[in-house]
Design a protein with these regions (language model features):
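Conserved hydrophobic positions within beta-strands
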Residues: 65-67, 102
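Short, conserved beta-turn/loop elements at beta-strand boundaries and strand-helix junctions
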Residues: 69-76, 119
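OB-fold (S1/OB) nucleic-acid-binding surfaces
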Residues: 81-98
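Well-ordered alpha/beta subsegment
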Residues: 96-130
Length: 130
């Protein structure tokens, strides 16, 4: 049995003033987290202010990561209709987890490196590779 559903298209406007370094980093092929100058808590996605009330500093995620979990999406939303089934991966890089995409057949525990690239629609994405 198949039930027809309605098409939903969303377009988000993201305020980026306080996180402009993150978006600029993606364009440069770099991914950043933020770390509190006082309590040393790390944040990804990055945030400008820590919950302890202090400012954070920008730190590039450079080390290797490890796949924590993944899923292959077969039910593709309209905004990704150009895509074939795709793999979403969450990888741990030290004290933060990062969600991204991979074209490789990654498994839990695999070592990965992080990079950025624009997709077919011109949106910057995070990619994982061995």
């Amino acid at each position: 049995m198949i039930v027809e559903s309605r098409e939903i298209k969303l377009k988000h406007r993201i305020p980026v003033k306080k996180t402009a370094n993150y978006w600029k980093g993606l364009e440069e092929g770099r991914v950043f987290k933020t770390v509190c100058r006082n309590c040393e808590k790390s944040y990804y996605p990055p945030r400008a202010d820590c919950i302890c009330g202090n400012q954070t500093e920008w730190v590039e995620i450079k080390e290797k990561g490890f796949v924590e979990c993944f899923t292959v999406v077969h039910s593709i939303p309209a905004c990704f209709e150009w895509s074939k089934p795709y793999r979403i991966v969450i990888a741990r890089f030290g004290d933060v987890c990062v969600m991204g995409w991979s074209e490789e057949d990654l498994r839990v525990g695999d070592e990965v490196f992080i990079s950025t690239a624009k997709d077919e629609s011109g949106i910057w994405k995070i990619w994982f590779r061995r």
